[in-house]
């Protein structure tokens, strides 16, 4: 931790956590897992150290390191392989079972990227215990899939539906493509899910929330037969700005078509079912 953060005090994290606990503060923790640095035996020790601080340490999230293209003079890191992701899932599932028996909850939760990278099914919703780290992206995919499944929104007049482009990160594309194929086949619509390559931060950054306005515009520019786009709300901040400081207002001017935003699966399904006009 000291090496990765280039901070001689970064190794004092357990003392820092204990100080918070001593002052009555409960904590949700997150580990950014890096191959060869803090995985394997180090991850096991981290888990043991944190679970020993339960219940004041309420949860432990584990997410894979994301590497941007801007890494000059930084420690050399790499991404996890699919096999490594499978092994991590297998180990964490054992710890979850142990915690569910002792604490009544999983306690340790993996980022969605591990399951997508491993090509494995996401855990059931109950394994997320109410999604306490949803804001950190833990269980976001499971939450979306269940919300999509439970939403009853459907076209009432398919011939009047205005087909839309839906840009997402490459990770979400793998998850959502089967849903879109099934939807289009069922309702005879022609909505288009678009996988957007992240040129701003680097091609290995594949989450939707880190897409920029310009990268989205570039990705949809070839689909001139569409005049409507549905943006995931997560690409905008509270001031309706993308990460490259393009405003939603400017985006609408540049796209020159209808621009709508969906906060979640329910809203997306409602917009997909919306009639044109």
State the predicted function of each range:
Residues 13, 43, 85-88:
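Aromatic/hydrophobic pocket-lining residues that form the small-molecule binding cavity
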Residues 24-29, 160-164:
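Short, surface-exposed connector motifs at secondary-structure boundaries
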Residues 8-11, 44-45, 243-248:
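Charged helix-capping and loop-helix junction motifs
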Residues 53, 66-277:
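Auxiliary Fe-S-binding modules of radical SAM enzymes
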Residues 1-20, 26-38, 57-65:
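Core AdoMet radical
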Residues 39-51:
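Catalytic cores of alpha/beta
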Residues 13-16, 46, 176-179:
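Hydrophobic side chains in well-ordered alpha-helices
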């Amino acid at each position: 931790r000291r090496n990765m953060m280039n901070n001689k005090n970064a190794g004092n994290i357990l003392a820092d956590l204990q100080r918070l606990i001593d002052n009555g503060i409960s904590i949700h923790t997150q580990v950014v897992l890096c191959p060869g640095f803090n995985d394997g035996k180090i991850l096991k020790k981290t888990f043991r150290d944190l679970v020993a601080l339960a219940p004041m340490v309420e949860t432990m999230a584990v997410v894979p390191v994301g590497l941007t293209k801007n890494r000059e003079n930084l420690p050399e890191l790499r991404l996890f392989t699919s096999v490594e992701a499978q092994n991590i899932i297998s180990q964490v599932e054992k710890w979850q079972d142990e915690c569910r028996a002792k604490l009544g909850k999983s306690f340790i939760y993996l980022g969605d990227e591990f399951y997508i990278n491993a090509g494995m099914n996401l855990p059931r919703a109950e394994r997320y215990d109410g999604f306490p780290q949803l804001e950190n992206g833990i269980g976001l995919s499971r939450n979306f899939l269940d919300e999509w499944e439970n939403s009853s929104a459907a076209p009432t007049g398919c011939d009047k539906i205005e087909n839309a482009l839906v840009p997402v990160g490459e990770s979400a594309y793998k998850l959502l493509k089967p849903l879109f194929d099934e939807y289009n086949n069922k309702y005879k619509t022609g909505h288009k899910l678009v996988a957007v390559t992240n040129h701003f931060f680097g091609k290995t950054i594949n989450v939707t929330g880190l897409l920029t306005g310009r990268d989205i515009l570039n990705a949809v520019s070839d689909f001139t037969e569409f005049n409507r786009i549905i943006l995931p709300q997560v690409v905008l901040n509270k001031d309706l700005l993308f990460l490259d400081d393009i405003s939603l207002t400017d985006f609408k001017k540049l796209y020159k078509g209808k621009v709508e935003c969906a906060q979640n699966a329910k809203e997306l399904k409602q917009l997909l079912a919306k009639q044109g006009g």
